[in-house]
From Swiss-Prot:
Belongs to the argininosuccinate synthase family. Type 1 subfamily. Pathway: Amino-acid biosynthesis; L-arginine biosynthesis; L-arginine from L-ornithine and carbamoyl phosphate: step 2/3. Keywords: Amino-acid biosynthesis, Arginine biosynthesis, ATP-binding, Cytoplasm, Ligase, Nucleotide-binding. Gene3D superfamilies: Argininosuccinate synthetase, chain A, domain 2, HUPs, Single helix bin. Homotetramer. L-citrulline binds at residues 96, 101, 132, 136, 185, 194, 270, 282. Its EC number is 6.3.4.5. It is found in: Cytoplasm. GO terms for biological process: argininosuccinate metabolic process; L-arginine biosynthetic process; urea cycle. The gene is argG. It comes from Shewanella amazonensis (strain ATCC BAA-1098 / SB2B). PROSITE patterns: ARGININOSUCCIN_SYN_1, ARGININOSUCCIN_SYN_2. This is Argininosuccinate synthase.
Amino acid sequence: MAIENSKTGVKKVVLAYSGGLDTSAIIPWLKENYDNCEIVAFCADVGQGEEELVGLTEKALASGASECHIVDLKEEFVKDYIYPTIATGAIYEGTYLLGTSMARPIIAKAQVEVARKVGADALCHGCTGKGNDQVRFEGCFAALAPDLKVIAPWREWDMESREDLLAYLAERNIKTSASATKIYSRDANAWHISHEGGELEDPWNEPSKQVWTMTVDPLDAPDEPEYVTLKIENARVTEVNGEALSPYQALMKLNAIAAPHGVGRIDITENRLVGMKSRGCYETPGGTVMFAALRAVEELVLDKSSREWREQVAARMAHLVYDGRWFTPLCDSLLAASESLATMVNGEVVVKLYKGQAVPVKKRSPNSLYSEAFATFGQDSVYDQKHAEGFIRLYSLASRIRAYNTK
């Protein structure tokens, strides 16, 4: 395969490296096209699974990297990115819990930190020119390291398919476990796993069983429900079934509990940031339980106006995270607005897991505004129903005046 004209001026590049076909090809391509620059591979451990990390360093070095940095970000990812985001109530287009989107800023931040540590003058990613991730990564790079050059091979090289990449590696005697028969494009982290490609590209096709890898088919889930209890403090899950856990531990435990019940599957056609629509299947078992529990406590503790404001913050935050604008003043502002409400989101929730559903069935909070004495339809001593008459007259005053004016 033809090699493009060599580019000069780049001495050391930090590549966001996964060990997959794309990034394995990027390493030799960078050396050939950027004046034999030094390549430092960087992998973020955001909970994608130990099996994805085994042999990664050896693979990177065999492909031509001078070193490989694997950075453990699992706890930080959940504590500083996932928890603050779900505390806002952010959910993209009503269904997507932003699993891929939330991971990009912490990965980009860690990549920049590695670049500073090794004295690199460029950053590289393997995102395609059609997707959201190129914007997310480069938006973060612009905010954190505007002085570093960004290299996006998919926007430069003439390779267009897996077959092209495999041929490229074969010509250079670089071994890879990838094959041309890979069906789906997947991205996993502690929060979720996404699936795209294959038969999913036709929205008339129902996802086959082989699409799903994290959760049990709800039809095959247990015939008996399971109940899980979550303790919530300041809109963060701190205990699961009475056991105090770190943010990452809590998520892992909920994943293990909810996945066998088929909880957290969605199949959506979303509006990408770059203008096109794409179809994706997502599995977010533990996150779905967390999200439901937080909303259940909010129902108890937030008054009407606060709830409306939280919904506005949630909608704006969902688009901001999806669009890759984490490191912005607006994100800081939205998170601060959310935290002022989060101080009231304390309580305990019991969630029923059954055949793909996660339904809060019990909830209580020391900050609850719900009063059985006020809400009862029976006789009570704290609410005089006659008082409602004056309220209704004032509440409907504008309607009454409008009616008089139209006579």
